[in-house]
Amino acid sequence: MPAQVTNLFLLENLEDASRTRELAESDRKALRAVADWIKTFVVRPHRDLGCAGPVCPFVPPALEHKTLWLAAERSAGRSAPDIVKLIDGYKRLLLAAQPVDGDDASNKSVFVVFTDLPAAQAKDFFDGVLQQIGVRSYVDDGLGWDPSTRATKGPRYTTQTFDRSHHLCRRY
């Protein structure tokens, strides 16, 4: 199934049952966990990473402009080429999302969360995708691509939740 606008949720939409009623409870729970992780980790400085600014500098402006979306997807039954097509669909949605030009065009991010992907399989899963994806085309379009396969630890976070997300952001 291709990426669809109806699969995109702003962080504040996750608390609105009328906006998320089509999602399985497990998907809602996973998206809420990633939203919490974004608000409490990704947008803040982290001394262990050696930078004074946020973990990802593209996320705070996207949050401020309400152009950061989460999408719940399933990995089951999908091959690496299927995932490449899916992510390409989200790439097109991101590039087409307003605004498409001007200074604010770079303040957009999409986090694709593979809600059924066990953390133990995430690295191999994303390695297979990386071997097939056209990273050059992402760079040419001014996009950053970050499959979160690194350990993310904090007071309430483990790799169990966050090794299965995939982040696209617009940057220049």
Model regions: which residues?
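N-terminal, charge-rich interaction modules
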Residues: 1-104
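Non-transmembrane, aqueous-exposed alpha-helical and coiled segments at domain scale
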Residues: 104-111, 116-168
